[in-house]
Amino acid sequence: VSPVTMDDVTSGFNIGANMSTDPRFNGIIGFSEREVRDMLSYYKDVDMLAGEVDEVIGVMKPWYDNYCFSRDSLHEPMYNSDMVLYFLNHYLPLKKVPENMIDNNIRTDYNKLRHLIRLDKKMGMNASIIQDIVTNGETVGTIKTAFPAEDLAKPDNFKSLLYYFGLLTIRGTKWGSTLLAIPNLTVREQLYSYLVEAYRSADLFSLEMDRLGMLVASMAYEGNWKPVFEYFASELKRQSSIREFIEGE
């Protein structure tokens, strides 16, 4: 739930309090690693877990862990509980890791993300916020507890919305501001794939989707981000030249 407010409409939010970054509530939604280990140990004790607890944790952690909702709770990263239960629902009966590590039910609504990308495009900034995030895996900003809809395109509000959508999490501090980062491989894959689809749907330029898909997969799973942006740059240059020739610019 995002804290977008309508200042010109009485919404009732003036009697509420935003607990999103209160360290006392960091662990209220999700599983701590101790809780995940206890759960796996139980299934191991009743002979339902095919692998060792540490082995299964090693598989789950990069995909489902690393959510933090307060700068004072960096020592207490949380697992997404829905993702953990999705994994166990497949792993326990089949005795193997699911082929698809991502539950479709947790995917951010595509239309929401497409709207965010359009907002990002309209900002007119020298460097796209989303491009900065997918390039570096992190960004700095201030998490806003509330902001009106008409101010959504302001950088800190935009980054805050990505945080409230679960696409960014608190990683620490940098330059006196909050360091926000992509939490795990699930969100990384989700963000990359939706970016590609949104750019394609917006008809910003046409791409060889098979080739781009391979580059994006390499970026998501192996961290090879440079070839993706080199491909974008070459296609932008090529297609801009064609458009200028056609339009006589």
Regions found by a protein language model. Name each.
Residues 1-249:
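Phosphate-binding site recognition
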